[in-house]
Amino acid sequence: GLFFIDFNESLNISNTAFGFAIGVQMLMWGLTGPIFGAIADRYGGHIAIISAFIFYTVGIYFLYTGPNTGIFFQIHMGLLIGIGLGGTAISIPMSIVGKHFPLSTRTIAMSIVTAIGSFGYFLSPIFTNYSLKEYGWNYTLFIFLLFLITGLLAAYFVRSPSKSESVEKVSDQSFKEALTEAFKTKSYILL
């Protein structure tokens, strides 16, 4: 939402178009999260995160370079960035951390990742607001691109362990079977 005024003034993006793009972004984030989770389970967390970072980076890049009005704004801001969020938000990194640490230290490791992620969520709007005021929306998006490229490079070095630290028996359950089981569980539905 911090970009709205700049997008409205520079690109003539209406609040309806901006709101719709954010709605598409949130929808794509929610829809692709389980898909990236399945990719992480099957091929490794690094593949899921790298794939998501590519979508996120391409979305920001095209938003930065244009064309970024009309349907292009919806594709870049809504679709691509939303898909990227599905695999780069906290859920996939948490699953990777969970697989890397034994039960005895898993809780502290996951707590550290959560704390760092939360601190990032705290700092991000402060930094974004400062950058927008000092440098404008275009340069702020360029800075975001640099952060994303750094994350993409770092994700390349993330490797899933060959064997999870806590899993003794690996389930042969398919993605469809897992979804069916989840939607039959009252706690999952309430969540």
Please name every model-derived segment.
Residues L2-G30:
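Extracellular/periplasmic helix-loop-helix junction of adjacent transmembrane segments
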Residues M26-P34, Y121-F122:
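Residue-level signature of mid-helix packing/kink "hotspots" within the transmembrane helices
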Residues L31-I71:
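Conserved MFS/SLC helix-loop-helix module at the cytosolic interface between two early adjacent transmembrane helices
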Residues G70-T88:
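Hydrophobic core of transmembrane alpha-helices in multi-pass small-molecule transporters
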Residues I112-K163:
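Helix-loop-helix hairpin linking two adjacent transmembrane segments in secondary transporters
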Residues R159-E177:
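Flexible cytoplasmic inter-helical loops of multi-pass small-molecule transporters
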Residues T180-L191:
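Juxtamembrane cytosolic amphipathic helices that cap and anchor the N-termini
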